[in-house]
Amino acid sequence: MEEMDDFTVRRGEREDITGAAGPPEERPLDPAAFEEDDEPTLRPRTLDEFVGQERLKENLRIFVEAAKQRGEPLDHMLLAGPPGLGKTSLCRILAAEMGVQLHPTSGPSLERAGDMAAILTSLEEGDFLFIDEIHRLNRQIEEVLYPAMEDFAIDIVLGQGPSARTIRMDLPRFTLVGATTRTGLMTKPLLDRFGFSARLDYYEPHELEKIVVRNARILGVPITEGGARQLARRSRGTPRVANRLLKRVRDYAQVVGDGTIDEETANAALEMQGVDHLGLDRTDREYLSLIIEKFDGGPVGVGTLSVALGEARDTVEDVYEPYLLQSGLIQRTSRGRVATRHAYAHLGFPVRDGG
């Protein structure tokens, strides 16, 4: 088998895909890598300010108004979709609309049943409990959530051994909002306890243009229609990516240009970041080139690809692949990943026979 460190992508870019130790390269297009970097001022504060996801927003408006009229908390809801599409922002908005407190946490941070019980007993009437990456909850935590979601109560075990007894503690009515990138990893009993489930879609370019223009105004950055259009086109259908790129292009315009983000400035800055006209970065192109050059276009298993890229399998499946699939650059088959004709053309490779 050929050594992986002999692999080279097109256009003379040398790629280290051995996973060797070294400082990790920042990916400007990784929507999962910089949620905490989002400036609070850029977050929409109301459903009217939230751009895109129109059908979902209309449903949520109705749910909020109906719950207010009845004086009840919102039903538990599950928001699914790739990272960076606004699941956390929507939860913040809904909590504000209902006039209640938001208590955020994440699946990986909840290790023991006691952790979950402590959070649940701290909630007040109507509060929102937001669990990001809810698909990563362990079974013990889920067992605590079942009665909490269904009956607004938790079972507490007192004592040990034969003398142990269980008491039920009532909880205030609350709303659990779960966010996930991997609905398929969630258990059916947990899924069944959500009264409403929705999947957030990638954004259209015109929606991202609105987001870029709005946030450029908030940041005090002059931007032309052409500049906003280029940023939107290369943001992978993801608002969080658009915000990250806007900040990087702002820096470039300030230092190299006259401070205004026009089409030429945006193009130059994004090319410097390694972001091409489809919104692919160096790692995306490495992924596609690996399938095409090393594995004859596929099929190749995601486990093999993750090892070759030096990335965790979950990262490849949750971060890299969704946009490549959405863009028609790869296909998932029962035997593995396959590069499409579109991928060959984009990277400048001749399409193989039957490809």
Swiss-Prot record:
Q: Name one GO cellular component term.
A: cytoplasm
Q: Which GO terms label this protein's molecular function in UniProt?
A: ATP binding; ATP hydrolysis activity; four-way junction DNA binding; four-way junction helicase activity
Task: List, as start-end ranges, the regions of compositional bias called Basic and acidic residues.
Answer: 7-17
Q: Where in the cell is it found?
A: Cytoplasm
Which Pfam families does this entry report, sorted A to Z? AAA_lid_4, RuvB_C, RuvB_N
EC class: hydrolase
Q: Does the keyword Nucleotide-binding apply?
A: yes
Q: Which InterPro entries match?
A: AAA+_ATPase, AAA_lid_4, DNA_helicase_Holl-junc_RuvB, P-loop_NTPase, RuvB-like_N, RuvB_C, WH-like_DNA-bd_sf, WH_DNA-bd_sf
- Source superkingdom: Bacteria
Q: Which range is the signal sequence, renumbered to this chain?
A: none
Which keywords appear in this protein's UniProt record, sorted alphabetically? ATP-binding, Cytoplasm, DNA damage, DNA recombination, DNA repair, DNA-binding, Hydrolase, Nucleotide-binding
Matching entries from SMART domains are given as:
AAA (SM00382)
Major subcellular site: cytoplasm
Binding of ATP occurs at 42-43, 84, 87-89, 150-152, 193, 203, 240
Region described as Disordered: spans on this chain: 1-43
Q: Where does DNA bind?
A: 313, 332, 337
Q: What is its EC number?
A: 3.6.4.-
Q: Which reactions is this enzyme annotated as catalysing?
A: ATP + H2O = ADP + phosphate + H(+)
Q: Region Large ATPase domain (RuvB-L): start and end of each range?
A: 4-203
Where does the record place the region Head domain (RuvB-H)?
Answer: 277-355
Oligomeric state and interaction partners are given as: Homohexamer. Forms an RuvA(8)-RuvB(12)-Holliday junction (HJ) complex. HJ DNA is sandwiched between 2 RuvA tetramers; dsDNA enters through RuvA and exits via RuvB. An RuvB hexamer assembles on each DNA strand where it exits the tetramer. Each RuvB hexamer is contacted by two RuvA subunits (via domain III) on 2 adjacent RuvB subunits; this complex drives branch migration. In the full resolvosome a probable DNA-RuvA(4)-RuvB(12)-RuvC(2) complex forms which resolves the HJ.
Cross-referenced PANTHER family = HOLLIDAY JUNCTION BRANCH MIGRATION COMPLEX SUBUNIT RUVB, PTHR42848
Q: Which family does it belong to?
A: Belongs to the RuvB family.
Domain remark from Swiss-Prot or TrEMBL = Has 3 domains, the large (RuvB-L) and small ATPase (RuvB-S) domains and the C-terminal head (RuvB-H) domain. The head domain binds DNA, while the ATPase domains jointly bind ATP, ADP or are empty depending on the state of the subunit in the translocation cycle. During a single DNA translocation step the structure of each domain remains the same, but their relative positions change.
| Name of the molecule in the record | Holliday junction branch migration complex subunit RuvB
- Which gene does this sequence derive from? ruvB
